[in-house]
Regions:
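Surface beta-strand/loop "capping" patches
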Residues: 125-167
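Catalytic grooves of carbohydrate-active enzymes
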Residues: 3, 7-14, 20, 54-131
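A generic structural motif
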Residues: 25-39, 121-127, 181-185
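C-terminal beta-strand-rich structural cap/linker in extracellular carbohydrate-active enzymes
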Residues: 182-203
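Short, surface-exposed amphipathic charged segments that create phosphate/polyanion-binding patches used
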Residues: 40-46, 68, 137-143
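Catalytic domains of cell-wall/extracellular-matrix polysaccharide-remodeling enzymes
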Residues: 2-46
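Extracellular glycoside hydrolase catalytic/binding regions
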Residues: 27-31, 48-61
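Solvent-exposed beta-hairpin/edge-strand motifs
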Residues: 163-178
């Protein structure tokens, strides 16, 4: 994985990385637009490099960072955070607060994250890269009847995750996967097999 400290990467530089450094499989930069920043989506690029943006960074957890984190939990159910090693030395990025306060900010944020989204998987950068590859490759067809919801997956490797909203009925037994309730009628589905069937119970 490569991450440029300034998040600046030109189109020419991006092309060179893929061509001259085939051992680089992942680039981590910005999810939100910034001046001169290399902006990414969670995806696999045409050249095969995994685009792995970070959502927030640092130890100054301000309102913008909270909004960004919450928005991405709602969008992809993902949180990615990066802290610069030299944040401890840069007053604009938290050094003026002191290490104890910076550490406390991060601890409070992680406590909030675990309490708010306990179903999030805790992955390393390399593991997240693999998850993005699976997410980008898998497709599905859905069949809904009065008795069940069936998903048939293509390009399935070993597991896949979906956000599932069940508007009618209550989910019962699940074959080929695991269903975790998130909120209201929204569920997190872990597909463990290429075919997943969710039984529908009457309300």
């Amino acid at each position: 994985c490569i991450r440029d400290r300034s998040n600046v990467l030109s189109a020419e530089g991006r092309e060179m990385l893929a061509k001259d450094f085939p051992e680089i499989r992942t680039i981590a930069s910005n999810y939100f637009t910034g001046e001169f920043a290399y902006v990414q989506e969670f995806e696999v690029a045409k050249d095969g490099i995994v685009e792995q943006p970070r959502i927030i960074s640092g130890a100054i957890i301000d309102d913008y960072m909270k909004m960004a984190a919450l928005s991405e939990l709602n969008m992809h159910f993902v949180n990615s955070h990066f802290i610069h090693p030299d944040d401890l030395l840069d007053e604009d990025r938290g050094a003026a607060l002191g290490w104890e306060k910076m550490k406390s900010n991060l601890a409070e944020y992680m406590d909030w994250l675990v309490d708010s989204a306990p179903s999030l998987r805790q992955l390393t950068g390399s593991e997240l890269s693999g998850a993005i590859q699976r997410y980008g490759a898998v497709t599905f067809t859905k069949t809904v009847t009065e008795q069940s919801i069936e998903l048939k997956l293509k390009n399935f490797y070993d597991e896949a995750y979906f956000m599932v909203r069940i508007n009618e009925g209550t989910p019962g037994e699940v074959s080929g996967g695991k269903l975790t309730h998130l909120t209201g009628n929204l569920y997190l589905l872990q597909a463990k097999e290429p075919t997943v069937t969710i039984e529908k119970l009457e309300d």
